[in-house]
Structure formats: structure tokens, C-alpha cells
């Protein structure tokens, strides 16, 4: 089986969806813009430096959503998709995903952004298989058939840095597959994904940051400049 793995932010999207969602919550009045943007910028700087504590970040990033009910949160996300994400989806990225799907490859998006933010984005790309940071949920609404609501904690292994290798390995194991059973390609922009790039058969440095570009050039990895990037 051919397996095509895609990072999301700055790889398929020219923006960071997690960061953009945080900014969006300030525009709709859920968070104080000065305080939120200061903290958001600090976390984003840590992410780019490879020093992010993802557990602390997820508590922060889900704080505004956790104060809202399920219906209000999902309504806000629908507006986020309409006003922020859909205009950012580039035809080049859609065409790249479609080329793998048309070739019969299994396509997965593997992202360090949480599932609440990213599941509708994966659907917008026509990708049904998503590995994202899974969010722990409480018992609210479960008696009525609901899935509970976000607690701010992470469920299972976060799909960040080396955790991406673990999560993809688990995905394969759940299908009675191993890495040796698949011909794997991984597209990413970030040095944070170096472990997964070193695991797959065909790493593709896509819109790479300076450090990843240097490594890709040294190792002879393919470099793909898919589109110009936003600064966030």
C-alpha cells in the first residue's frame, strides 16, 4: 500500500490553523485580544523553536472553547472555516492531495494541531483519515448520546514531534500493518517533524523552514515549494 502523509499548517495551508483559530476567537469577543495575542505569540515562538510544551499549549488553546457549549463552539468553527480557512486553501495543495488519491494512495493528514480545529479542515481537503492531537472529554451529554466536552487535557499520545511517528505506527498497527508493509511519503515544512521524515521512504520538505531546508539539501531529500507562506 502507498501511504501519503501530509502535515497541515504551512504545508497544505499557507497559514497556521491553530494560531489563526486563536486570533479568530479574539475577533468574536471570546478572549481579550491583548492578553491572548501575547500568550499565543509566546507559544508560537516556542513551536517554531521546537521547545513547545504541547500540554500547556492545548490547555491554553482550548480555554475559550471550553467556556462555550457544543453548539456555540461548532457554530463559531463553521464561521472560522468560511471566513479564514476556505479562502486560504490553495489549488496547488488541493491538486497535490488529489494526485495521491487518484493514484490510489491512502492519504492521511498528520498534524500537531488539535482535532477540534482540524477535523473540518481535513474534510475540506477531502481527506477522511486524520491524525491530530486528540482532546480528552468529560461526561457531559454522554447520557444523551453525546461525546462529552473538551477538558483541556490531551487524550493519548500527542501527534507532535516524535509523537507523530508513534501515532502513525499505531494507525498502521490498528490495520495489521507495519512500516515495512507500506511505501510511505511525508510532506512537511517543519524541523519539528524530522523524526517522521527520517522514518518514511520518501520525505518531502514542503515550503520548508530554513533549518529543514538545510537538512533536506544535505541529505538529498526532495524540496517542494508549493506556495508562498503567511508569516503566521
Task: Label each PLM-derived region with a short phrase.
Residues 43-70, 130, 134-144:
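Short, compositionally biased "basic patch" segments
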Residues 15-23, 70, 134, 158:
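Active-site phosphate-binding/coordination module
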Residues 1-52:
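Active-site neighborhood of HAD-like aspartate-dependent phosphohydrolases
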Residues 1, 75, 82-232:
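C-terminal cap/substrate-recognition subdomain and adjoining C-terminal extension
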Amino acid at each position: 500500500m502507498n501511504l501519503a502523509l501530509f502535515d497541515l499548517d504551512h504545508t497544505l495551508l499557507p497559514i497556521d490553523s491553530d494560531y489563526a483559530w486563536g486570533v479568530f476567537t479574539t475577533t468574536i469577543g471570546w478572549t481579550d485580544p491583548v492578553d491572548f495575542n501575547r500568550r499565543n505569540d509566546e507559544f508560537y515562538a516556542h513551536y517554531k523553536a521546537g521547545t513547545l510544551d504541547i500540554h500547556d499549549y492545548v490547555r491554553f488553546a482550548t480555554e475559550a472553547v471550553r467556556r462555550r457549549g457544543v453548539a456555540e463552539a461548532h457554530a463559531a468553527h463553521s464561521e472560522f472555516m468560511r471566513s479564514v480557512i476556505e479562502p486560504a486553501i490553495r489549488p496547488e495543495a488541493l491538486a497535490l492531495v488529489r494526485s495521491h488519491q487518484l493514484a490510489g494512495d491512502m492519504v492521511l493528514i498528520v498534524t500537531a494541531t488539535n482535532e477540534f480545529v482540524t477535523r473540518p479542515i481535513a474534510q475540506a481537503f477531502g481527506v477522511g483519515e486524520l491524525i491530530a492531537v486528540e482532546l480528552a472529554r468529560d461526561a457531559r451529554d454522554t447520557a444523551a448520546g453525546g461525546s462529552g466536552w473538551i477538558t483541556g487535557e490531551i487524550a493519548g499520545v500527542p501527534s507532535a514531534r516524535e509523537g507523530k511517528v508513534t501515532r502513525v505506527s499505531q494507525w498502521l498497527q490498528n490495520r495489521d500493518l507495519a512500516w515495512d508493509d507500506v511505501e510511505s511519503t511525508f510532506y512537511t515544512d517543519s524541523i519539528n517533524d524530522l523524526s517522521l521524515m527520517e522514518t518514511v521512504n520518501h520525505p518531502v520538505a514542503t515550503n520548508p523552514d530554513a533549518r529543514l531546508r538545510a537538512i533536506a539539501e544535505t541529505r538529498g531529500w526532495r524540496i517542494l515549494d508549493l506556495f508562498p507562506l503567511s508569516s503566521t
